[in-house]
């Protein structure tokens, strides 16, 4: 894979028709304010995020402020959702978190004000302020 579409050791990204697909093997990069995700400049064009199951983590602040994002599909196999991963995704209404996810870090879905409910594994570890107070969290047996 070309270096310009890398977003982790062995993890790549592709953006087409509003769908951002994360594929490959391993953990995504944890992005920061000073080193944002490579698609940050196009954040307002992303409507769907697909994370394939061979990717083990969703990187910190990876999809921060993707304000057009409505649908997130995380495939079974992903284990971690890092801090602030979807912070400020104000249009997000459909979120699929597989039972393989065992840890969701601080503020991962902070500011996702359109989200109403989510289902996670019953022993999933949650840090502080993962979801807005308005989100109904349901638990399923892992």
What kind of region is each of these model predictions?
Residues 2-49:
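N-terminal segments that cap or nucleate solenoid repeat domains
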Residues 17-26, 43-57, 67-80, 90-103, ...:
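Structural signature of tandem-repeat unit edges
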Residues 30-32, 59, 128:
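Short acidic, gly/pro-rich beta-turn/loop elements at beta-sheet edges
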Residues 34-39, 83, 125-127:
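Intrinsically disordered, low-complexity boundary segments flanking structured domains
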Residues 38-41, 57, 61:
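Amphipathic alpha-helical interaction surfaces in cytosolic regulatory modules
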Residues 59-62, 82-87, 105-110:
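Consensus positions within tandem repeat domains that build extended binding/scaffold surfaces
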């Amino acid at each position: 894979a070309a270096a310009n579409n890398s977003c982790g050791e062995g993890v790549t990204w592709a953006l087409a028709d509003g769908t951002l697909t994360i594929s490959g093997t391993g953990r995504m990069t944890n992005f920061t304010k000073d080193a944002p995700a490579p698609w940050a400049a196009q954040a307002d064009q992303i409507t769907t995020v697909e994370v394939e199951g061979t990717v083990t983590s969703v990187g910190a602040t990876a999809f921060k402020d993707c304000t057009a994002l409505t649908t997130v599909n995380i495939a079974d196999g992903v284990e971690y959702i890092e801090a602030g991963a979807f912070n400020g995704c104000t249009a997000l209404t459909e979120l699929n978190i597989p039972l393989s996810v065992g840890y969701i870090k601080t503020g991962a879905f902070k500011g996702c004000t359109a989200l109403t409910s989510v289902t996670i594994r019953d022993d999933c570890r949650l840090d502080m302020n993962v979801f807005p107070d308005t989100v109904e969290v349901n638990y399923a047996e892992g």
